[in-house]
């Protein structure tokens, strides 16, 4: 171990930093128990993305577009084995895991808010907001459709946690505006997240584009002249990823 430390293969605490197996990707709600091995854990928690609002039915001179959905909040941090074990022990031997579902695309209205993802009560990452019902515009006007707001700030409630172990803690990004400029119309792109790309804002002839990966916002939708109403797209689901290091 001394040799490894001298050549820089372990840190001052003696951790080798070797990844033990593939990361554990938790995409469904359940319970988290202490891993059998590992001395250091990187924990990534992603709230779900917001859905996009639907586009309105249009007349021979009407247009409609919605903005993209907002992204979910995100936390990434390190815990030692002793720290994680103590937190699990206090919670009764396991942590309840809640994985937020992506916001549902609007049907005749606004998109849904993404669900909150929780690592017990220790890390809470709210989902992104859905975008509003698509604007009603026309060939003689210019209008903007607001994107979904970002997810609220995450909450880290780990007693005594050294702030240097928090890699990233941030609210999600807002969705992009949709726009209608007299005749052309383009919906807003969904917000990206650290673990996914937002759905693409669609043109009048394109189909819905859901959020990709995890925690990203849905792409907005749009309608050209004389079109039936078009449902919004769905945001990306939340996730928890745990990496175990020797």
Please name every model-derived segment:
Residues 1-28, 132-141, 152, 161-162:
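Glycine-rich, low-complexity segments
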Residues 9, 48, 216:
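Glycine-rich, acidic and aromatic/proline-enriched surface loops and short helix-turn segments
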Residues 15, 23-38, 108-112, 116-117, ...:
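Surface-exposed ligand/attachment interfaces on beta-rich extracellular proteins
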Residues 19-57, 158, 162-164, 169-173, ...:
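Beta-rich globular "head" domains
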Residues 45-121, 219-242:
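Glycine-rich strand-loop-strand elements at beta-sheet edges
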């Amino acid at each position: 171990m001394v040799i490894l430390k001298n050549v820089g293969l372990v840190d001052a605490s003696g951790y080798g930093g070797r990844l033990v197996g593939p990361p554990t990707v938790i995409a469904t709600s359940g319970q988290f128990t202490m891993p059998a091995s590992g001395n250091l854990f990187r924990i990534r928690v992603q709230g779900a993305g917001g859905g996009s609002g639907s586009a309105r039915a249009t007349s021979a001179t009407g247009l409609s577009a919605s903005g993209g959905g907002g992204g979910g909040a995100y936390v990434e941090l390190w815990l030692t084995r002793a720290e994680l074990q103590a937190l699990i022990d206090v919670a009764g031997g396991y942590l309840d895991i809640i994985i937020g579902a992506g916001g549902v695309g609007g049907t005749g209205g606004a998109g849904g808010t993404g669900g909150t993802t929780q690592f017990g009560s220790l890390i809470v990452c709210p989902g992104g907001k859905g975008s509003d019902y698509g604007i009603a515009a026309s060939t003689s006007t210019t209008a903007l459709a607001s994107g979904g707001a970002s997810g609220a700030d995450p909450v880290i409630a780990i007693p005594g946690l050294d702030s240097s172990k928090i890699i990233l803690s941030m609210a999600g990004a807002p969705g992009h505006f949709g726009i209608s400029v007299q005749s052309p119309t383009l919906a807003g792109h969904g917000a990206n997240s650290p673990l996914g790309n937002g759905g693409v804002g669609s043109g009048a002839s394109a189909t819905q584009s859901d959020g990709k990966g995890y925690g990203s916002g849905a792409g907005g939708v749009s309608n050209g002249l004389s079109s039936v109403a078009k449902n919004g797209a769905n945001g990306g689901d939340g996730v928890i990823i745990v990496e175990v290091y020797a």
